[in-house]
A protein has these predicted regions:
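Alpha-helix N-cap/loop-to-helix initiation residues
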Residues: 7, 33-34, 121
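Rossmann-like NAD(P)(H) cofactor-binding subdomain of soluble oxidoreductases
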Residues: 1-13
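A short beta-alpha structural unit
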Residues: 61-66, 153-159
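Long, positively charged, glycine-interspersed low-complexity recognition regions
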Residues: 162-168
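Interdomain hinge/lid region at the active-site interface
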Residues: 87-157
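Internal alpha-helical scaffold of NAD(P)-dependent oxidoreductase catalytic cores
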Residues: 17-102
Length: 168
């Protein structure tokens, strides 16, 4: 089992006691695990305050992590290294900073994670490349309706992730 929460900053000085609050926690049992062991994993997630505790098979876990974590880190890294315009940091807004926050990455840990899950990550990279190629084609063909449709679909999907604000 493991959390789906972290921080791009290294070191104990960057620890955060609320890092797991409203985060997701994934239990990945194998045929070697007992029901009691799985229950203990779930209880740990509850004690730490995770908002959602899910269970995935090892295969489904690897595919999901390849998509929601490793692909996103790869996209952020690629975005930061694909262009060498000078002083770009002087011209960015929140969207660029939000999208690239995770490009500040622990290369020792993440290179290992990428290679340990390379088949799933390669699969997700292929799917992403196909989708970004569709956008490129629509731009080349000035397909405004196609672009708008892609934007509508992405907006609808993104709404599924929005968490309701907790009133303080």
């Amino acid at each position: 089992a493991h959390p789906m929460a972290g921080c791009e900053k290294l070191g104990i000085q960057n620890s955060n006691e609320k890092i797991f609050y409203e985060a997701n926690y994934i239990v990945v049992p194998t045929d070697k695990n007992t029901e009691e062991g799985k229950d203990v994993c779930r209880q740990i997630g509850e004690i730490l305050g995770f908002a959602r505790i899910s269970e995935l098979s090892p295969y489904a876990h690897d595919e999901m992590i390849g998509f929601v974590s490793q692909l996103t880190h790869g996209i952020a890294m690629s975005l930061m290294t694909c262009n060498h315009m000078e002083r770009v940091e002087d011209y960015t807004g929140d969207s660029f900073r939000d999208l690239t926050r995770i490009a500040r990455i622990d290369e020792t840990l993440w290179s290992e994670l990428f290679l340990l899950n390379k088949d799933a990550l390669l699969h997700q990279l292929k799917l992403f490349t196909m989708e970004i190629s569709k956008l490129e084609r629509m731009l080349m063909e000035a397909d405004k309706e196609g672009i708008k449709d892609m934007m509508r679909r992405s907006t609808a999907r993104r709404k599924l992730f929005d968490k309701e604000k907790v009133e303080e």
